[in-house]
């Protein structure tokens, strides 16, 4: 069952990577980047099967959340500029 979950998350990560390079809108690129970072934190938690892996996944997730807040702020600022 975990293999299917890892494959699905990996597919989503690859899809977001492709969309980052194909998208022209900077705001959408930032949203896809945010989704990609959450996929990476999920894959870290699933692959590293130890307490240290959990700590790394939690740390990466917290940093991803902070970066997603920065992304949301940047998108809001670009709306004011445009």
From Swiss-Prot:
InterPro entries: DUF2109_membrane, Prd_NiFe_hyd_3_EhaC. It comes from the Archaea. To M.thermoautotrophicum MTH386. This is Uncharacterized protein MJ0526.1. It comes from Methanocaldococcus jannaschii (strain ATCC 43067 / DSM 2661 / JAL-1 / JCM 10045 / NBRC 100440) (Methanococcus jannaschii).
């Amino acid at each position: 069952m975990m293999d299917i979950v890892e494959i699905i998350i990996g597919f989503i990560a690859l899809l977001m990577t492709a969309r980052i390079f194909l998208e022209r809108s900077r705001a959408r690129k930032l949203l896809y980047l945010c989704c990609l970072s959450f996929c990476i934190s999920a894959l870290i938690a699933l692959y590293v099967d130890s307490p240290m892996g959990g700590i790394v996944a939690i740390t990466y997730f917290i940093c991803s959340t902070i970066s997603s807040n920065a992304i949301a702020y940047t998108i809001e600022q670009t709306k004011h500029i445009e």
